[in-house]
């Protein structure tokens, strides 16, 4: 069942041609996307829904980088949503470095982008609106009257409410990300006409729309744990509401930490997605068995190939020689691109950072989240060369190796090592624990002891202490902290340890007031140890191409 939804997406990709030019927020013309052939069967509708999901991790119509990509004029290998979000949410923070100067990566690394000099920013904007266009399409076509008219009502009458709710959920997620990244953006829905010029909504209006959608569809989504793998249910809805409420003060100017706590607590208390027994299992090729993942974006080495999903999170983070030190799952295919910044390394105890070739899973570390490569010849922690300059030398900086294209028993998966089979955990329960704890520290009505319990639950797991202890794995040091250690600075550091590379770091730093100022890291503002930058970088600019095609839009302040 794991890959059925995404296999359907591949099947219908050839019918659902999806190239986009410059008018990225314009609604799709029916002749471009929709044919009666697509909607003549129940499977056709399922395929369109699958395309909505798959557009967040796949890139085109042929798999891999085989051409016929979704975005016209974009590099298919670069332009998948998850990879793009890494550049916008991780590369410009205290987590990771890539030395590349192509497609705006150096501008992202240095926090020196503008409306025209960073293709990856433009492609992220386009990707989100492309997915919104797909969801609008199925919402137009998946109505009771059209199902009756096309003779598929009997086949879909029990499912179409779920299909519509899931499409609205995906659309709400995309708008929440546009709200986060770009602020005030154009609004389109299923009623926007082909010739209509999309109107720009304020950041608060976009926020309120997405939140209202989540509230309206909650009971139309599948009950917790009742949907097939890869599709969302009510727990995903609660999770996204918690995330939006937690960021509401930044995004709208009005805080609602009480609601953030309540919805995060619902995710925890529901119990359908309990924490995995081993942190490391969340990022492996058989992570479809991992109970913690609420919303996985499905990747498969045979049936759902992409160089932009978890394929990137393995290959870009390793080089060929590393496969001789441990089982990367991609053989010698590593690209040798991404290194950890010194600030990420320093978030862990120095003893835990060191890679032991006799203990490649880190079983004898205290904190098993400290998954670094330090054993390459000449490897150093610093991300600069002997002249204190930026360098492409992969051993200037430690590797980060929590993503591995192998199974829990350290075996290659059946799909092989050309592409990865690791599903990306877009939402997972550990985040609900830390969101709830943070909301309490920010004023939600719950005891501080509850926040402490939530944080300690998250910390016990990677220390494998107390109830998480397993034979043969070090568990003599508890991960628990005491009440006096629990504060917002600790929460920000803990989120870095728990979620590094999981596409939330920029959002976290902004929420804690530590993104543009009051906190520096390698190469921020182009300086080796970092300096403050202008507050305009709290938002990305509306792409210049979008402003040209829709002159009614107003650019974000400072660009």
Could you say what each language-model-derived stretch is?
Residues 16-18:
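C-terminal motif of bacterial Sec signal peptides marking the signal peptidase cleavage site
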Residues 20-22:
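Bacterial signal peptide processing site
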Residues 37-44, 49, 53-62, 76-85, ...:
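Elongated scaffold/linker segments in the mid-to-C-terminal portions of large proteins
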Residues 41-42, 46-50, 54-60, 92-181, ...:
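Conserved, well-structured interaction surfaces
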Residues 179-180, 186, 247-253, 442-445:
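Short coil/turn linking the two alpha-helices of tandem helical-hairpin repeats
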């Amino acid at each position: 069942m794991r890959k059925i939804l995404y296999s359907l997406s591949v099947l219908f990709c050839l019918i659902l041609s999806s190239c986009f030019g410059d008018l990225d927020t314009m609604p799709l013309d029916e002749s471009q996307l929709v044919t009666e052939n697509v909607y003549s069967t129940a499977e056709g509708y399922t395929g369109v829904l699958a395309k909505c999901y798959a557009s967040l991790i796949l890139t085109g119509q042929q798999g891999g980088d085989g051409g016929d990509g979704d975005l016209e004029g974009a590099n298919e290998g670069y332009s998948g949503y998850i990879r793009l979000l890494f550049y916008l949410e991780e590369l410009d923070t205290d987590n990771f470095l890539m030395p590349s100067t192509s497609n705006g990566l150096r501008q992202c690394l240095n926090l020196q982008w503008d409306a025209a000099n960073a293709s990856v920013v433009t492609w992220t904007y386009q990707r989100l609106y492309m997915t919104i266009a797909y969801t609008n399409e199925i919402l137009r076509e998946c109505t009771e009257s059209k199902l009756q008219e096309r003779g598929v009502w009997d086949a879909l009458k029990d499912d179409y409410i779920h299909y519509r709710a899931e499409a609205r959920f995906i659309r709400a997620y995309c708008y929440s990300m546009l709200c986060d990244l770009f602020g005030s953006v154009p609004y389109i829905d299923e009623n926007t006409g082909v010739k209509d010029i999309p109107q720009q909504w304020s950041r608060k209006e976009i926020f309120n729309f997405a939140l209202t959608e989540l509230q309206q569809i909650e009971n139309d989504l599948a009950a917790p744990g009742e949907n097939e793998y890869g599709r969302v249910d009510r727990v995903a809805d609660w999770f996204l509401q918690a995330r939006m409420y937690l960021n509401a003060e930044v995004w709208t100017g009005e805080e609602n930490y009480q609601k953030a706590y309540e919805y995060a607590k619902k995710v925890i208390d529901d119990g359908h997605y309990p924490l995995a027994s081993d942190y490391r299992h969340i990022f492996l090729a058989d992570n479809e068995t991992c109970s913690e993942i609420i919303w996985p974006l499905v990747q498969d080495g045979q049936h759902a190939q992409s160089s932009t999903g978890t394929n990137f999170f393995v290959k870009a983070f390793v080089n060929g020689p590393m496969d001789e030190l441990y089982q990367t799952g991609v053989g010698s295919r590593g690209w040798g691109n991404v290194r950890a910044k010194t600030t990420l390394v320093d978030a862990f105890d120095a003893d835990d950072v060191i890679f032991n070739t006799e203990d490649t899973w880190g079983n004898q570390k205290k904190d098993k989240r400290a998954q670094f490569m330090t054993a390459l010849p000449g490897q150093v922690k610093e991300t600069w060369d002997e002249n204190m300059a930026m360098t492409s030398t992969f051993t200037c900086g430690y590797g980060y190796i929590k993503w591995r294209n192998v199974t829990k028993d350290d075996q290659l998966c059946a799909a092989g090592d050309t592409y990865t089979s690791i599903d990306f955990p877009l939402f997972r329960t550990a985040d609900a624990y830390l969101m709830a704890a943070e909301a309490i520290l920010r004023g939600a009505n719950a005891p501080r002891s509850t926040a402490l319990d939530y944080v300690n639950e998250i910390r016990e797991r990677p220390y494998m202490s107390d109830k998480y202890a397993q034979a043969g794995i070090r568990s003599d040091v508890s991960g628990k902290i005491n009440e006096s250690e629990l504060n917002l600075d600790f929460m920000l550091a803990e989120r870095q340890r728990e979620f590094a590379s999981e596409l939330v770091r920029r959002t976290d730093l902004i929420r804690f007031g530590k993104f543009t100022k009051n906190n520096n890291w390698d190469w921020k503002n182009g300086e080796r140890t970092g300096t403050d930058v202008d507050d305009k970088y709290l938002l990305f600019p509306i792409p210049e191409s979008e402003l040209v095609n829709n002159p009614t839009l107003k650019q974000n302040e400072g660009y």
